[in-house]
Amino acid sequence: DGSVSTAGSKLVLSPELWSAETPNLYTMVLSLYDSKTGTYMGSVSQQLGFREIEFTKSEVDTNGNRITTDSEYKPITINGKQLLLKGTNRHDTDPEYGKYVPHETQEEDIKLMKQYNLNALRTSHYSNDEYLYYLCDKYGIYVMGETNLESHALMNQGEKQVNFKNLAMDRTVTAFNRLKNRTAIVMWSTGNENYYSSSASYANGMFYDLIWYFKNNDSTRPIHSESSDGNNGTDMRSNMYPSVDTLYSRAAANMPYVLCEYDHAMGNAVGNLKEYWDAIRSSDNMLGGFIW
């Protein structure tokens, strides 16, 4: 088919590590030469950062039920320090330009986030413009990389959801291959409000397969799925809009926990923010959250 693949490696000694606080980046340049004549054919470059995310990988039985016990989980860390997400959800849209958001506006968004001590972004609920990920790498923003999958209307109708299995897998594969080399992506997400079943066979294994596509292809990032308790292989618990009391119970349970949406910031909202964060800071297994 005219394609060729190759593999190589290079050891980088004592690199300056990347994090939201210190977004150190390096530039990798790959150049192609004709193997017979040595003629230069062209180059591509990619910015990348060095960082290590450590987490406990959830194991499941053949039915998708989690067999990793709560006590076996360790806090999720980046470069040996607790990963704490002070984040927001963001739709890739603009009141003036609609779905075409200028690069300048995207950069203004990221700069405002940094100025207000936000360090994380959930790309609700789809992959965003490539430039946004470049900015997150550059400025230091942790990103939950979401598959373009939102199934509100069919949330508990597996017999109908299965009709979209090929589409969902295609979007998952596309998101992964497009974003896998982005330093800012610190976790993967299978989308938004998709399903609430712990069974691996639900929707003919659709969501189980999406989760395990990520797990089988990337052992360096944890997997998120809203409302999952680790079943089907997700590596953290997640809920939308829980009570403060629920947060304390999750903190006591030891498994990593993230608020993928909370404190709906519309109208007279964003209540109990201090109480939420008192609960989040009460235990190292708490990952923080993303305001809606």
Where are these regions (language model features)?
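Secreted/periplasmic carbohydrate-active enzymes, especially glycoside hydrolases
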Residues: D1-S124, L135, G140, R171, ...
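Substrate-binding/catalytic cleft of secreted carbohydrate-active enzymes
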Residues: I110-L112, A120-W292
